[in-house]
Amino acid sequence: MVVHVSNPVARLTRTQVSQIFLRKALLWDNRQPVLPVDQAPDSPVRRSFTKEVHRRTVASVQTYWQQETFAGRGVAPPERTSDANVLAYIRRFPNAIGYVHADARLGNDIKVVIVTP
């Protein structure tokens, strides 16, 4: 998981990350809105993230979001087509959180958040 360097979060549990990306957790501890950003549905990193964090398939999470949207309860996080686009989103919106490939070049304005079981 990656966030803007100004974000005070350093560690999250897998459950917290899942809640953030399913928009069940809406605020950081500092009361600022959490802005999750997903990768494209066909991205290998998205498939891996979804399996590890949500314990579901991408299709299952997409179905969840279709139901939530139809019921008027929320909309899915925005999707970006590459690591570079996820990082650009986080740079633009310091309250954002996303995920990228392990070998992505982060730069000094992005930091890694440790995810624990």
Where are these regions (language model features)?
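Exported/periplasmic ABC-transporter solute-binding proteins
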Residues: 1-117
